[in-house]
């Protein structure tokens, strides 16, 4: 069985960026239906089909979205009749993700979880706690088909798209971890969600936009997060960017640009051969105009590749007078890559030139590098490569999730200004 990328302009070759068909082998049938995949009316129909009053679905939804109760914590669901809990939870909260490994660093303020889906696909999410907010970086695909050579995820290829519920589950888990004080810093509240984990979000357009609506909607419909705390990244799938502008979702759009010229960007971001810099930025400005939201321009600083002052000038020229902010990311190391992050002096020079040209610029305060949880490092690597392991239980014994068992600077992470 094959499946194609969910591009609104039709399938494209994510590895070369050329307009040909992209196929991948699915490991199994679609993930089980989960309440996060369903509208409120659809959930109520499920309850009625089980011989229960429709409002039982609302009760289950409130436990999940508002109380953040695990489906295996049936004793906490005292408003559900005991004989109805099993059928309702089996139908509305099936097992989707099982934690295969959990790693932490930054004095316990950063936690990466590797998840295994029911069909064996692997994905990762990262929770990061800052003094003024808590952010979760979620995956939208298992793997990635965009083929960017400096990104570990892209080098592993694409396994499949994630379902809406598989995306939402990563967020609900993060909210639960913070509420239950399982992360350093005491009890907290999830404030930001960034679609910057594994995968190209806009290549899984339908599931990602549905997940955004679930995250924004109030309980029992959804999690009730602020749309302004949500960020969707893209390497530049132009038709999907334009489509997103019309969705009525005032989320932040982050464009992974990495080069101001087509010659270099063709090498760094292969999809650029399909949609070059001018088209990507035109779609970004359209998004900013329609939504009123400032676009974040993501730019990985690679030593001797894209960090010269001439390219800073070229970037400033492209962004002059636009509703945009540049988020510079010192390249994070990935296995097999000879590229390195720009030296601090080079970073400062790049920032200085952009700021001299009037461009709002920050440098990401990278989190999670030592556990391969930083930007471009997510690859669901084997547990043996990890440096510090909090939990490395076998998948079979790990507690499943959902089982009847940004701020100034980068919206994704903390930022610092180099002076």
Swiss-Prot record:
It is an enzyme of class 2 (transferase). One of its GO terms (biological process) is rRNA base methylation. S-adenosyl-L-methionine binds at residues 199-200, 233, 256-258, 332. One of its GO terms (cellular component) is cytoplasm. Its cofactor is [4Fe-4S] cluster. Residues 397-419 have a biased composition (Low complexity). [4Fe-4S] cluster binds at residues 144, 148, 151. Residues 130-369 form the Radical SAM core domain. It is found in: Cytoplasm. Reaction proceeds by a ping-pong mechanism involving intermediate methylation of a conserved cysteine residue. Belongs to the radical SAM superfamily. RlmN family. This is Probable dual-specificity RNA methyltransferase RlmN. The gene is rlmN.
């Amino acid at each position: 069985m094959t499946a194609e990328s969910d591009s609104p302009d039709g399938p494209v070759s994510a590895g070369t960026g050329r307009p040909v068909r992209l196929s991948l082998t699915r490991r199994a049938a679609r993930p089980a239906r989960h309440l996060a995949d369903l509208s409120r009316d659809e959930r109520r129909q499920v309850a009625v089909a089980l011989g229960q009053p429709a409002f039982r679905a609302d009760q289950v939804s409130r436990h999940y979205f508002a109380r953040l109760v695990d489906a295996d914590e049936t004793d906490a669901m005292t408003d559900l009749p005991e004989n109805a809990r099993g059928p309702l939870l089996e139908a509305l909260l099936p097992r989707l993700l099982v934690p295969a490994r959990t790693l932490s660093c930054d004095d316990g303020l950063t936690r990466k979880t590797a998840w295994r889906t029911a069909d064996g696909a692997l994905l990762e999410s990262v929770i990061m706690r800052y003094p003024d907010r808590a952010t979760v970086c979620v995956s939208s695909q298992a793997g990635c088909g965009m083929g960017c050579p400096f990104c570990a995820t892209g080098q592993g290829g694409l396994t499949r798209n994630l379902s809406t519920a598989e995306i939402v589950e990563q967020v609900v888990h993060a909210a639960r971890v913070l509420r239950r004080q399982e992360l350093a810093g005491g009890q907290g509240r999830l404030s930001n969600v960034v679609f910057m984990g594994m995968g190209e979000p806009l290549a899984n357009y339908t599931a990602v936009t549905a997940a955004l609506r679930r995250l924004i909607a109030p309980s029992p419909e959804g999690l009730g997060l602020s749309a302004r705390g949500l960020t969707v990244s893209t390497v530049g799938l132009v038709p999907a960017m334009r489509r997103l502008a019309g969705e009525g979702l005032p989320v932040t759009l982050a464009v992974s640009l990495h080069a101001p010229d087509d010659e270099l960007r063709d090498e760094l971001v292969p999809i650029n051969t399909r949609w070059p810099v001018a088209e990507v930025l035109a779609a970004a400005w359209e998004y900013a105009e329609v939504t009123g939201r400032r676009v974040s321009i993501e730019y990985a600083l690679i030593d001797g590749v894209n960090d010269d002052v001439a390219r800073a000038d070229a970037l400033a020229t492209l962004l002059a007078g636009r509703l945009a902010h540049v988020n510079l990311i010192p390249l994070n190391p990935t296995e097999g890559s000879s590229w390195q992050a720009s030296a601090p002096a080079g970073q400062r020079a790049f920032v200085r030139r952009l700021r001299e040209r009037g461009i709002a610029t920050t440098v990401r305060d990278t989190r999670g590098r030592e556990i391969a949880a930083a930007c471009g490092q997510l690859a669901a690597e084997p547990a043996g490569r990890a440096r510090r392991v909090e939990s490395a239980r076998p998948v079979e014994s790990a507690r499943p999730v959902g089982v009847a068992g940004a701020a100034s600077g980068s919206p994704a992470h903390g930022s610092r200004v180099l002076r």
